[in-house]
Amino acid sequence: MKPVSQLLSAAIALTPLTAAADFMGLYLGAGSWQSAPAGGIGRTDIDLESTLNLEEESNGFAYMAIEHPLPLLPNLRLQHSEMNWTGSALITAGTDLNGNPFTTSQQADISLDLTHTDATFYYELLDNISDLDLGVTARLFDGEASLVGSTQQETIELEAVVPMLYGKLGVAVPTTGLVAELS
């Protein structure tokens, strides 16, 4: 009987007294990045860079993520991104943003707002020195594009929900609290 009690005592002594696992996590963040619009918009495919003279601007974002231990329910990340550009350009006759072509060439103020909010539902597949998250995102655009000339004005409302896949890979540097992420 003595060997059994010694074995049991050794097993208890080697067992950690606490187990560490994430119970709930709340993550908040904000940032800014330089972005430039590219491509065309409107019925006559107006070039955002060469025709409208929209240039690189600093735009901000903020996010919140909630993680929990329930395996069947996905985690949630909400992110709001402000994306606005303004400029001024000579608009030629026939330029058509939204079905009402400009009748004369004129100087116009341009604004492009691609502000959007992301709702991401994801599962945390790895959560140790490396993190792997996979899920889906619904991106809700709520913006507009407008051309305001001396005699005419046109506006397009830009409202749409865009479904996307979501993935995040992170690697932690042990004992430093630093993490490199790619999403």
Predicted regions and their residues:
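Transmembrane beta-strands of outer-membrane beta-barrel pores
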Residues: 30-36, 80-86, 125, 138-144, ...
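Cleavable N-terminal export/targeting peptides
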Residues: 1-24
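Residues on the lipid-exposed face of transmembrane beta-strands in outer-membrane beta-barrel proteins
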Residues: 28, 62-68, 119-123, 136-138, ...
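Flexible, solvent-exposed loop segments that connect beta-strands
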Residues: 38-52, 86-112, 142-157
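Transmembrane beta-strand segments that form the barrel wall of outer-membrane beta-barrel proteins
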Residues: 176-183
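Short glycine/proline- and aromatic-enriched beta-strand/turn motifs that initiate or cap beta-hairpins
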Residues: 21-84
